[in-house]
Design a protein with these regions (language model features):
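N-terminal helix-turn-helix
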Residues: 1-75, 79-80, 87, 239-244, ...
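Juxtadomain coupling helices with adjacent low-complexity linkers
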Residues: 169, 193-194, 211-263
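Short, basic/aromatic recognition patches
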Residues: 81-89, 154-199, 244
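Sensor-regulatory modules in signal-transduction proteins
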Residues: 202-205
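Amphipathic alpha-helical effector-binding/dimerization core
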Residues: 56-156
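C-terminal regulatory/oligomerization modules of transcriptional regulators
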Residues: 112, 120-125, 184, 255-263
Length: 263
């Protein structure tokens, strides 16, 4: 990994639940020596990607991040496009729905809405990177990504988050084949205990998966009927979203989705 990559990777540690991080915490989280870490943080600060709380000296995201996020949305307005579909599903089924795009090490949520008022809810941090191997979003994306990318992800040491997290590359590859055949991914407590999720990919102009739509829900509220409802809601939304984005749904996926909607 290049010096620039190592420095930029530090930005991934920030989240809504972790808006500020001090030098010592960075060292604990990254295992990078303090000297190198300080140089990386100084470079990011000088470039505007980070700023320091003058009282605590902890680092937080800087104005350059906001500017680039605005440029991205103005030039590639995918957030505005997916927002309609996420809101629609969330309002219909009264559960947490989110859209995510792939990054190097996982899926990054770009928009989420919890349409329910249940006492038991899924705690979701939009700034958190969702691991490819442990989430329905990640698996739905991997199933329709190129073999080289998938190979790199599965060749790494796969972290176990719960007793149900899949960490065997062969088993995951087999699951990806199943996902390719049906067009959606389902996970049961593989990333967080008592939480299940369903996800479908959405596709770009070349028929490649460029992101996912997903529903996360406490497993106590999942039954066969509602499971089917979630899948049909996601398939319908992704089909329309692909149309809006000018995307091409692969023929086998379109057939699988059409069959599912007929049931």
């Amino acid at each position: 990994m290049s010096t620039i990559e190592k420095a930029l990777t530090l930005l991934e540690h920030f989240s809504s639940n972790r808006p500020e991080i001090g030098l010592t915490e960075f060292k604990t989280r990254t295992s990078i020596d303090k000297g190198t870490l300080h140089r990386h943080l100084t470079a990011l600060k000088n470039s505007g990607f980070l700023e320091q709380n003058y009282l605590t000296k902890a680092y937080r995201l800087g104005p350059a991040v906001i500017r680039l996020a605005a440029v991205r949305e103005n030039t590639v307005p995918i957030v505005k496009t997916v927002q309609y579909y996420v809101d629609r599903i969330a309002n219909d089924i009264h559960e947490l729905v989110h859209a995510a795009l792939p990054q190097k090490n996982g899926m990054s949520a770009i928009y989420a809405k919890d349409g329910g008022n249940h006492k038991v809810r899924v705690n979701f941090d939009e700034a958190e990177i969702l691991p490819f191997h442990a989430t329905s979003s990640g698996l739905a994306l991997l199933a329709f990504h190129d073999d080289t990318f998938v190979g790199k992800i599965l060749s790494k040491k796969l972290v176990s988050f719960t007793d149900s997290t899949p960490t065997n590359a062969i088993d995951i590859q087999a699951n990806l084949e199943t996902i390719r055949a049906c067009g959606f991914a389902f996970t049961d407590q593989s990333y967080e205990d008592e939480v299940g999720s369903v996800a479908v990919p959405f596709f770009g102009v070349k028929g490649d998966a460029i992101g996912t739509l997903a529903i996360a829900i406490p497993v106590s509220r999942i039954n066969e009927t509602f499971h089917e409802t979630m899948i049909t809601q996601l398939i319908t939304a992704s089909t329309e979203l692909c149309r809006d984005l000018g995307g091409q749904i692969p023929t086998n996926v379109a057939k699988a989705w059409a069959t599912k909607l007929e049931v």
